[in-house]
Amino acid sequence: MDEWLAEFIKRTILKLPFSETATILKTWGFLTESELQTFTLRYPKEVTATEVVRFCEARNATLDHAAALDLVFNHAYSNKKTWTVYQMSKRLESENDLFDASEFKLQFKKSIHAVSKNVTINFKEFGEALWIRIAWGTHNSRPNQYKATFAVYHSQTPYVFITGLGKACQPLMCQALVIASKYSQIQEMELKSRCLESLKDIVFKRFNQPFSSHHSKPHEKALTPNIVDPRVTYENMREKDRVYHLTCETFGEGPLPKLELASYKLETMFKADSAMSGNLTAVNEPFRCVVKFSSPHLLEAIRSLAPAGIAEAPISTLLSCIPHKARNSFKITEKRSMHPSSSQPTNV
């Protein structure tokens, strides 16, 4: 086994949490059951990693085996990366609509290798998802195994979740995906998150849907604590009930997909009367700014704003529409009419 390959396997093992090392190695499936039984997890992790490499050298591990280990690791810890959603469209007519994983892999590799031979491609299926790992190289250098691109594709859906894709490799990657999946177009959606499962929940519409306004209001018993002292009155009970009901109409009552960021790019022209007109209003270029909201769980944070009294209910649709429009990046511009002073805000 080459020295660089042994080093790559060793570094992958060192990234594993100590308590999960045995589980990951078992999922990897390269080491035999007897080898796993004789294997001893020891501190420091360097000792454990060296022992794994020794087993791999004895069994002549290849790059494919190392890539499989990397796939298992990134599947288990997918939240360590930021994922972007791509949507394909205009599916090509085919006599057989059933997904053939072998044909997909063949066409994907063929499409990329037709342009660049110095690329390693590996696949691994996890349930209904096909994971793809691509390490890109150049004419002068071998594929960089430490900066691989990962793509997750669910057959019979037009969505692909990608992380680690550089701009230079994006056209080739997108071309390979549409050819292999038998679509004709693909575009990047304005939707990103570290939580891969939450992105799937959004585009597959698996998250809790809010109930319509014609539903009966929640019982007050569920909204408020028991009144210990009957002399205590809740003067704002009606307002709390209204806020709770509007919040449920907007976001539902169940758990929401986990997103960490939402950004809004504002583009508008300065407008002022003649007394206030100056250099700014004379400039034809629009004013631009970016507003970003961040939180470990942004949608839950937004849902809690009105009940906490921080914002009025209902919450602005610019915030509440995130899961339904399947995007967390917006551009807000103005609809300009023929009259230069007439404009209306709009969001894209």
Swiss-Prot record:
The record's annotation in Pfam families points to: CENP-N (PF05238)
| Species name | Xenopus laevis
Any idea which UniProt keywords this protein has?
Centromere, Chromosome, Nucleus
Listed name of the protein: Centromere protein N-B
Compartments annotated for it: namely: Nucleus; Chromosome, Centromere
Q: According to its UniProt record, where is this protein mainly located?
A: nucleus
Extract one GO BP annotation from the record. CENP-A containing chromatin assembly
NADP: is it a keyword of this entry? no
Question: This protein's superkingdom?
Answer: Eukaryota
What is the protein's known function?
Probable component of a centromeric complex involved in assembly of kinetochore proteins, mitotic progression and chromosome segregation.
Q: Where does it sit, as one GO cellular component term?
A: nucleoplasm
InterPro entries, per the entry? CENP-NAC/CAD_complex (IPR052011), Chl4/mis15/CENP-N (IPR007902)
Q: What family is reported?
A: Belongs to the CENP-N/CHL4 family.
